[in-house]
Amino acid sequence: SFLDEGLLPAEIVNLTATITAFNAISDTRKESNKSIYTELEKIARVQSVKGSNAIEGIVTTDARIKQIVDGDSAPLNHDEREIAGYRDALDEIHSKHDQMSFSENMILHIHETMTSLAGYELSGKYKTEDNLIMEIDERGRRRVRFTPVSATETGEAMQQLVLAYMDARDNPKINKLLLIPCVILDFLCIHPFNDGNGRMSRLLTTLLLYRSGYVVGKYISLESKIAKNKNLYYKALEKCQHGWHDNKEDPSSFIKYLLKIILAAYRDFEDRINVVSNKMSALDIVRKAVESKIG
């Protein structure tokens, strides 16, 4: 596989090393910054629910999103039920990720949690009809951006996705962090659900990061960063989808994109901790750690 060939692009190696160094530092600081961590967690939760839904055009006012996320108000319409469902799925990942192994049953369970409040007919079930990934340009013209796996082949494709993940996860030559964007890319190319694939991909990203020991998504919203860079997200995705059906895709663009999002989250995390606690920046420590790892 791409990840096991041993000759990864230098940019990907650098990004991975820097993220790993930041992650190690964030772990050591939690005990002395508990109140800051708790506050960041509350903010990130609202931003994640807002950002991930906004990418799909599911919106309400900021005040309503906060009320729904905080559990202060029941959802009032379809969009708000979608938002509340995402909140429930994200909360479960934040609180129970150590019990949520990456499996078909777990993926279906997360989809059911995310969609059940909105009354999806196929909540927690794979698609029954073929779907297309469409794009609308600035003139309103529609084009097919990608043709996912057919409905009849989806069950088999998802089974293979999970098995491939388990094999790669247990391979000591493969960096667990690099595996995550590859899994998410495959998931988006399969597009296993009639609806909710984009939001599911972001929930699964958070789950897989947790299970690989990277907790930044709890304190800084990855979803809001993706929402702010939506065009870059779609460009990286489309570039990597070329040749996917023939196993000839090059996943490096999507790997770089997602690693940059994760690194930006860690940098934000570090900045916010420093602003409040006034401690020395970890950038020098990270640089030294990266240099020693690369050199």
For the regions a language model picked out, list residue spans one by one.
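FIC/Doc superfamily catalytic core
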Residues: S1-G295
